[in-house]
Amino acid sequence: MYKLHRNCDIAHLTTFGVPARCAALLEWTDDGDLADAMRLERLPKPFLIIGGGSNLLFTKPFEGTVFHRLGQMELDAVCESYCREGVWGFENLSGIPGSIFGAAVQNAGAYGTEMKDVVHEVKVTDLENGDRFILSNRDMQFGYRNSAMKRPETAGRYLITDISFRPKASGPTMTHKAVRQIIESIGTENATPMAVREKIKALRDSKLPQPDQTGSAGSFFRNPEITACEFDALLQKFPDAPHFVQADGRIKVPAAWLIDRAGLKGATEGGAQVWPLQPLVIVNATGSATAADVLALERRICNEVALKFNINLIPEVQHI
């Protein structure tokens, strides 16, 4: 069975919790229900697919149909399951909010691991014609917080209905300094996927707001990548700038460091605030923040970072 709601409030479907409405909301449980709805109902376009709603900011009422599958498995539950089985590859993804489907679309990642490192293939339904097909890891064309599912021609059209995983790691992924410190603290001989997962979760909990207490969309900005020449200019003024050299020679600079050094940790606009413990996150501090509050704070952050560092920040959160 499916449920179709008209002109409804969907703030509860997002982790930000700012006011949000849509012309239609379609909720269903299995693929047969979805097929029935697509055949029987006249659904206003455009279409928007929501997983766990953890990477969205509704800036105005959505005039189309929001698709929301009920009972989606959370990414963290999958991480816990694999870690309990002693399988390496998911431990660094522990604690990331949202569904496995949304995480794949976004190529969610943390501490040196991304969804591209664990996804084998995905099953997809084309909402335009009902066709079903399979995309391999390569077909997904994963990039930094990006995938083939986010392209203008596929977003809102291709719906992931199932995912299979094939983690490739044979041990802990230690490209991130924090993970290396975790392995050192517990000892290589005691390093199990579950032990690392618990440390990763504790680290996240120490810096990030609890989703059931404070609304947010997780990391609000992408970590900018700049050229070696631009990074040399940055080092002239800020020799302590943290950085990560990418495979193509570009330099990734942590957005959290830029925001912090711009003096914006804890900054507020209306009910929106830069999270004091992790400036990469914007939170609904009062529980009554509006999209206008968040956008005003976003503009302020972008302007001040650009002025101080000559670096343009790009939001990671999808603006609707």
Residue ranges and their predicted role:
Residues I301:
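Phosphate/pyrophosphate-binding loops and the adjoining catalytic core of nucleotide-dependent enzymes
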